[in-house]
């Protein structure tokens, strides 16, 4: 059917062909989603009805280009989304350019042309192509490259672009009927898990070799409600850490990479073999059809493959523009901060008998910190991008969540209740003298809202000598019942039991995590009872018994 003539034109007058810029097309999509009149838009932009329908049909492609563009200037200049003839060469060259820019290496126009010629020869292409100044201009316009100086990959925040992207995202969610259970965000963060300062002699430096700064990259992913948190992916430098030898269950997925960074191969493997199966399993659990749609929101990073490679049936990805990610990406709106606050990273000196904090302890700490982030933090993190999700829950549920985060610990409970408390213990052994631990513990309590530790720990019910069962009236007790066990002996026994459980398949990952939590509570009680400066404590947070470590080895 022929489109109606634009408003203001007579039937006999032929309308002049108008080719809108990509920015104008995006504005039209946004205004259509807001419910503005089609006739008013036809008159304003001097286009026909068929043009409006065509623009709306290509909304997804417009969104992808908007997400990958370097600046709004590309949207104002470019009018079509036509792909180049040598599409594979164009994609490889653009990825090379992004890599150099992220490294801070300046890339000039002649350098880009020479690299394009090199790729052309390496790919053994036969289709003629002239790598001229015009070709360079079209390449920059095609990818929205504003400058080639590439001083940094980090882009300044663009509030106008953020508003446009938010409008697109909400319309996309409405178009596909997506709920908060079906929308995910993933992001990476680096952890130097041996990097905290070490207790030093007053007025002097630490003797011995320099303290190591072992690095982990952690990939975290969760949906908008926080009800589905995937097991974190930890990337280290070593393919087979000695600390993992014989371990039956790990609370995280682990991959090795030379620089402990996420690369495209690792991310693609995570997407197809961990993310997609986990999402479908979650859908089965909550009663959604397995073929329900799911969206993964990512920032623009050279470690992430192209969108076309991150698709599996009804599971697809959307990239945030570089100038928008810092403003609206959910992981940057409180989730990462809460995770880092929960992460326990004690100082571990390279000398002394207690230098046992290893990779295994670090990844258990990662799992504890990740599972400790309250659900309401996830919902609130989407308030800028998707306000309807952030305020979907009532105030009563928020109060319940606060109660879950900061439980009030009773002083006199049965052993069954104590075991429930034990799940909240920490799992990061280290060495810290009492003075440093006390000062660090004050800072930790201030970070948690100024909640001081209780005067009496519930763990005293278990370990207090006053509660120890007495021998029978006839003086005959069980074998070994009259022998006192020193704190140091008990600590060694705890370590031995934990090492044994970690290497036995009959113990589940959750049970191993609970043993670690129990050991943490024991060491906290040891610190309070013995009161010696050289007593080993697991972390400053344990002076107040950490609020979380519940099911560190399972997905919530």
Curated annotation (Swiss-Prot):
Summary of the tissues where the protein is detected: Expressed ubiquitously.
GO molecular function, one term: DNA binding
Gene Ontology CC: one annotated term: cytoplasm
Record-annotated DDE-1 domain positions: 213-382
Phosphoserine PTM positions: 414
Region (Disordered): 439-482
Family to which the UniProt record says this protein belongs: Belongs to the tigger transposable element derived protein family.
Record-given protein name: Jerky protein homolog
Gene that specifies this protein: JRK
